[in-house]
Amino acid sequence: MLSPKRTRFRKQHRGRMKGKSCRGNRICFGRYALQALEPAWITARQIEAGRRAITRYARRGGKIWVRIFPDKPVTLRPTETRMGSGKGSPEYWVSVVKPGRILYEMGGVSETVARAAISIAASKMPIRSQFIRLEI
């Protein structure tokens, strides 16, 4: 699963997801892509599940680019713990996704294969998303 090798700080504020994605919202590598339509935190497990789904469906053909990386630690407190005594320890990593962000890209396959593979990956995501293709 994806996670940073090292970070400057162990814990982060939650932050807020305002507005649309201004970076990473254009197709750069492949011909087809999955684009987010809602804001969300997407976990490293969900990213990996989507990547595996696309890889399995596409078989040997094509290439996949994962355009998001989980770089935000999410902390959790142990269950049945009293309040206080600091913030919990980091449990998993998430990627902050805003509307318009490209999640996956695909190339080297026909549009029908890409559409089917990306729709399977889209069903693994916790948000609404759309299939887009590079207009040439």
From Swiss-Prot:
Task: Enumerate the InterPro entries for this protein.
Answer: Ribosomal_uL16, Ribosomal_uL16_bact-type, Ribosomal_uL16_CS, Ribosomal_uL16_dom, Ribosomal_uL16_sf
Gene Ontology annotations of biological process type: mitochondrial translation
MF term (GO), any: structural constituent of ribosome
Source domain of life: Eukaryota
* Record's GO cellular component terms: chloroplast; mitochondrial large ribosomal subunit
Alphabetic keyword roster: Chloroplast, Plastid, Ribonucleoprotein, Ribosomal protein
Q: Does the keyword Ribonucleoprotein apply?
A: yes
Q: Which HAMAP family match?
A: Ribosomal_uL16
- Spell out the subunit comment: Part of the 50S ribosomal subunit.
Output this protein's name. Answer: Large ribosomal subunit protein uL16c
State which gene encodes it.
Answer: rpl16
